[in-house]
């Protein structure tokens, strides 16, 4: 079997995990085994799509790679952030010289914000039950 040249990156955001493979091509997109015209067909929201493909835009590599993405967990917003980090990390495997550009736009930083856990005695993480003086 012929070995396919590709670049791999893992991205995480909130509870979403994305495994991204970049393969030299003309910009085809495959998410969770299903072919899409563009990422916009998967994310539906143009803001999430723009956020996800930003690493390709700032490095002028948009249309040079086919994207094969496996993403699970979280919602579409978290998945968008996970895909973004995965693409950025895969681009580093492709060319280490892209690091300063990606670093400048903070695309190699994993967003550490997670949902705060709910505490007992409270309605949510911080929301206390209503208090009545009388």
Curated annotation (Swiss-Prot):
Q: Could you state a single Gene Ontology molecular function term?
A: structural constituent of ribosome
**Entry annotated with the keyword Ribonucleoprotein:** yes
According to its record, what are the GO cellular component terms? cytosolic small ribosomal subunit
What are its GO biological-process terms? Answer: translation
List the keywords (alphabetical).
Ribonucleoprotein, Ribosomal protein
Q: Show the Pfam families listed in the entry.
A: Ribosomal_S9
Q: Which domain of life is it from?
A: Bacteria
**Basic residues biased stretches:** 120-134
User: Which SUPFAM superfamilies does the annotation name?
Assistant: Ribosomal protein S5 domain 2-like
Keyword Ribosomal protein listed: yes
Question: Which stretches of sequence are listed as region Disordered?
Answer: 114-134
Write down the HAMAP family for this protein, in alphabetical order: Ribosomal_uS9_B
Family named by the database record: Belongs to the universal ribosomal protein uS9 family.
Q: Give the protein's recorded name.
A: Small ribosomal subunit protein uS9
Q: Which organism is it from?
A: Thermotoga sp. (strain RQ2)
Q: What is the lineage of its organism?
A: Bacteria, Thermotogati, Thermotogota, Thermotogae, Thermotogales
**Gene name, please?**
rpsI
